[in-house]
């Protein structure tokens, strides 16, 4: 595999972007798209062809889990970084919805809109990466959480990173520039894969430093390690064993099924870690629930955390 091209990856797993990038092999039968050796079969439901049906169930299950997580985060009124974490989970919901669109054929790979939806998916995935890093740094309390300045900074950072990834991906897919076309994918590979991997590595390192040097308990370290395990396992199953899984499952599922499931478990571990390192003033929360208070402000707001306490 040459650095920056998707030939080897797309021959193993049926990523959505594989339908809109070109093979560096000039003798390929297709001018656009790289067909994997094995991919999950489509299913016809109500005269509608649905791709990746197993992956669709994982996405729907993930949406239900995310709604439960958001409900629990919203109920933890006084926890550190509550608003910023909510923003992260909202991004994940948007990412799952975009994945449903491109994975299940809501926008068919042959349509003109498909490249735009794939670019949106990559942009949302990148925005989620930079968002979780922001939340990780927020735990060190370098700035006030939940403030207007903090939230607008988070929104601007995520939007800018989304735009960068979206534009690079779209220009690559559409071949609008001679330096970036469907066969010259190095820039997209570096930005979408390499830089985002570095961002996630920084997040993990920062949280390990936080647990080791700032917390009284090492139990949250278990949530971090489990999250890393699920994430790495998902990447390995998606990019290395997708073909074996597909053949073993008679084309009903492939590596994307397990990759998506592992990503959901990773998000659950991120929530669990945040839940373990933050505490809530129970008396304050219950009192406000009884009185129907939905928003707090001013200096009298109580916030609790196990960090630097």
UniProtKB/Swiss-Prot annotation:
Name the residues that span the membrane. 51-71, 86-106, 114-134, 156-176, 194-214, 218-238, 251-271
Please name the InterPro entries in this protein's record. Chs7
Q: How does it sit in the membrane?
A: Multi-pass membrane protein
Q: Does the keyword RNA-binding apply?
A: no
Q: Which keywords annotate this record? A: Cell wall biogenesis/degradation, Endoplasmic reticulum, Membrane, Protein transport, Transmembrane, Transmembrane helix, Transport
Annotated compartments: Endoplasmic reticulum membrane
* One GO term of the biological process aspect: protein folding
Q: Which GO terms describe its cellular component?
A: endoplasmic reticulum membrane
Task: Report if keyword Disulfide bond is assigned.
Answer: no
Q: What is its main location?
A: endoplasmic reticulum
By its UniProt entry, which PANTHER family does this protein fall under? CHITIN SYNTHASE EXPORT CHAPERONE (PTHR35329:SF2)
- Protein name, UniProt field: Chitin synthase export chaperone
Which species is this UniProt entry from?
Debaryomyces hansenii (strain ATCC 36239 / CBS 767 / BCRC 21394 / JCM 1990 / NBRC 0083 / IGC 2968)
């Amino acid at each position: 595999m040459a650095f920056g091209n998707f030939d080897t990856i797309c021959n193993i797993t049926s990523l959505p972007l594989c339908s809109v990038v070109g093979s560096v092999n000039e003798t390929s039968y297709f001018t656009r798209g790289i067909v994997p050796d094995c991919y999950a079969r489509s299913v016809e439901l109500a005269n509608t062809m649905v791709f990746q049906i197993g992956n669709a169930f994982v996405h729907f299950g993930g949406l239900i889990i995310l709604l439960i997580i958001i409900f629990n985060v919203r109920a933890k009124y006084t926890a550190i970084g509550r608003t910023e974490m909510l923003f992260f989970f909202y991004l994940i919901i948007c990412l799952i919805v975009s994945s449903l669109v491109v994975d299940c054929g809501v926008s068919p790979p042959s349509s003109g809109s498909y490249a735009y939806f794939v670019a949106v998916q990559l942009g949302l995935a990148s925005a989620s990466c930079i968002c979780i890093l922001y939340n990780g740094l927020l735990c060190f309390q370098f700035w006030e959480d939940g403030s207007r300045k903090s939230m607008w900074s988070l929104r601007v950072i995520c939007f800018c990173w989304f735009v960068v990834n979206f534009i690079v991906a779209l220009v690559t897919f559409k071949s609008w520039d001679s330096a970036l076309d469907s066969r010259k994918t190095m820039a997209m590979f570096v930005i979408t894969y390499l830089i985002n991997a570095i961002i996630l590595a920084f997040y993990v390192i920062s949280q390990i430093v936080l647990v080791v040097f700032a917390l009284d308990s090492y139990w949250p370290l278990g949530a971090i390690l489990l999250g890393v395990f699920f994430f790495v396992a998902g990447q390995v199953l998606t990019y290395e064993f997708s073909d074996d899984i597909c053949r073993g499952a008679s084309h009903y599922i492939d590596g994307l099924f397990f990759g998506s499931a592992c990503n959901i478990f990773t998000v659950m571990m991120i929530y669990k870690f945040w839940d373990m390192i933050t505490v809530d003033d129970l008396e304050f929360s219950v009192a406000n629930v009884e009185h129907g208070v939905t928003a707090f402000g001013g200096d009298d707001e109580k916030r609790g955390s196990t960090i630097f306490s």
